[in-house]
């Protein structure tokens, strides 16, 4: 086959010289088109799942879910924590909260005055160093599924703990899966017999936490421990509207 001059400009042979920008695309735009196509394919795969998931409501943080938070502060106490060890926060034996230096009980009466429905229970602990200019972190370990007859040790050795959350505040959810808390008059039970309040009312329906606190310091540190229980109360809507009229 001889030389054919027309083949120089044949588009089918790929030798066409394009000099206008209408037929040119930058490499970045080509990559963006590929990325958008992948995104559309991924969205098409997730559409059936999203249709089912849209039927459910969840919260990113269960503590910030629906309901009213009612706090009962059990005690504030100063503890001395030795290096490489962790101390038990409370042993749940009435008012004997392992006091060392001093203990101040905050709540004399139960804050829930009516028979409300308890949706959730949280154990909250706040930690603060007692001496200024101390550079260490608070460590923590806890257990929820301990046997009721298990006697916890007051001091344990640190072994793979984790750091306490931001602002030195940590919350632990004590709810048992599949257990509903009954409507009871918690205020009268709490005021009449505080020592038996936990064993008779709370622990049959919620986990009894064993919480240990330590520090990363190489010296003996004095820390302030504030222990609270946070009850999440269901807020009931009124049976009848408070106002009548066209606007309601």
UniProtKB/Swiss-Prot annotation:
Q: Name one Pfam family in it.
A: Polyhedrin
Question: GO cellular component annotations, sorted alphabetically?
Answer: viral occlusion body
Question: Which molecular function terms from Gene Ontology are attached?
Answer: structural molecule activity
Q: Keywords on this record?
A: Viral occlusion body
- State the superkingdom: Viruses
Q: Which InterPro entries match?
A: Polyhedrin
Q: Does the keyword Protein transport apply?
A: no
The entry's function note states:
Component of the virus occlusion bodies, which are large proteinaceous structures, that protect the virus from the outside environment for extended periods until they are ingested by insect larvae.
The record's comment on protein family reads:
Belongs to the polyhedrin family.
Name used for this protein in its record: Granulin
């Amino acid at each position: 086959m001889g030389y054919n001059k027309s083949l120089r400009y044949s588009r089918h042979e790929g030798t066409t010289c394009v000099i206008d920008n209408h037929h040119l695309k930058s490499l970045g735009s080509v990559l963006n088109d590929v990325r958008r196509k992948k995104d559309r394919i991924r969205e098409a795969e997730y559409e059936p799942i999203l249709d089912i998931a849209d039927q459910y409501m969840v919260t990113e943080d269960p503590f910030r879910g629906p309901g009213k938070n009612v706090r009962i502060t059990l005690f504030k106490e100063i503890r001395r924590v030795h290096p490489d060890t962790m101390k038990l926060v409370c042993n749940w034996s009435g008012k004997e909260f392992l006091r060392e230096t001093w203990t101040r009980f905050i709540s004399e009466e139960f804050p829930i005055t009516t028979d409300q429905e308890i949706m959730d229970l949280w154990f909250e602990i706040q930690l603060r160093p007692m001496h200024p200019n101390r550079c260490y972190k608070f460590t923590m370990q806890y257990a929820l599924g301990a046997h009721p007859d298990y006697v916890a040790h007051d001091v344990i050795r640190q072994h793979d703990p984790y750091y306490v959350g931001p602002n030195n505040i940590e919350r632990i959810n004590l709810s048992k899966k599949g257990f509903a808390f009954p409507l009871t008059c918690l205020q009268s039970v709490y005021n009449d017999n505080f020592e038996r309040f936990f064993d008779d009312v709370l622990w049959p329906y919620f986990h009894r936490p064993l919480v240990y606190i330590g520090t990363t310091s190489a010296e003996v540190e004095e820390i302030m421990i504030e222990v609270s229980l946070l009850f999440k109360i269901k807020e009931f809507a009124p049976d009848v509207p408070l106002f009548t009229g066209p606007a309601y």
